[in-house]
């Protein structure tokens, strides 16, 4: 809003105080995991942005995505390899730069800190629906992951359980491809299917 007003030649300092006698407090209506499940299943980028702001209020006391990201990168994610660059909550910006190595490290950290039961209940599995449904419906108990797609980019990161019971963490990031997105996703599926079936 301030940017829009500034373009119109209107400037005024922000007034940051409540009306007398009014104390604003958060009102929580949903459990975190149920919100995360919805966001992951439907790839809801708006939810992702709002959750980052809500996390910011808890972590820094501000509804500021940049401040929140900076705080998380300096504390919680300071040990991630390859120095990721993270700029938004939804992952839609091409300025986000994170390696498969960093994604795998983050996924392993999540599993260790939150436990497999919780993490697997939030991520979409191959038979559940969402963006995995068309490619992994024949592996409903073997793939727990999240896709990401932009023009010329296709990603899939998560966990797989092989038919021999091994759990592996993986991350595919295919950048600047010229092929149809479906062909890229099929190639990734072929690789993961071989790992599930034979390892």
PLM regions: where:
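A small/polar active-site loop signature that marks catalytic segments
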Residues: 1-117
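C-terminal soluble interaction/assembly domains
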Residues: 82-199
